[in-house]
Amino acid sequence: MFLMRGAAASGLLTGAPYLSANPLGLPIGCQTYPVRKSISTDFAGTMKGLRAAGFTQIELCSPYGYDDFSSLQKYKPQELRRILNDWGLGCISAHWGSNELFQKADESIAYAREFGMTQMAIAALGPFNPKTSQTVDDVKRYVEPFNAFAEKAHAAGIVALLHNEGFVSAYIDGKPVYDMMIAELNPATTKLQFQVSTLQQGYDPVTYFQKYSGRYLSMHCQDWVKDSSTKSGFRQVPLGKGVVDWKAVFLAAKSAGVKNYFVELEEDPALMPLSVPYLKSLKV
């Protein structure tokens, strides 16, 4: 099980977990990618720990598209759902690999439907480490297969989500690729999931929630402080302990139509449970 510290660890050990709390009228969610190593060895135990820490909803990564989640292939989708239900965790969303969505769309959609998911997300379109030679034509080329997948997903009652990492958060000739991609997406079949840490690249969540109100459904939440000793110049901290104005973010998110959010602190998974008390106390 992943390490928990402080109040979150105390709650688990004493049998007094943070119970259901929806400070924004939304479940407190957790992206499971930061705890992927723990999931690979003890899925049920990791889910127990997340629930004890106060999370009531998770977002998975596909067992067939993410190597660190491949141990979950031994479960049928309904079995995974049953384990989550046993621990009182909801799961309506997962991240998928591009090959799963573009080359194996029918199989992936069938898996999601059997699981009971209503959202299928992709972390990025195009390269995760984009080159300066990328062009506007590349943007259109990357969006085209996602629109095709989204049409199939929509017909099956599932929403296709575009997350903004990698090339999606890059710039071409000083212009944001993200806006170019949004312009190419079919708004009838796609929604957006905002990565709050892209504020570090100049993508302000409040600005985007206001600019594209109605297009967003979800977001990943990170907080950080400046730290010159790190390669990025930033260091992640629990939500509410860093530079992000969460009240402003959640107010804008609520107005934009965001229906779920997931804490995702990959640098140190132990920071995620420490974010729960702040989220429980936050009022917007």
Task: Pin down the residues of each PLM region.
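N-terminal export signals
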Residues: 1-21
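Hydrophobic faces of well-ordered beta-strands that scaffold small-molecule active sites
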Residues: 26-31, 58-60, 91-94, 120-122, ...
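Active-site acidic/histidine proton-transfer and metal-coordination neighborhood
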Residues: 6-7, 12-13, 64, 90, ...
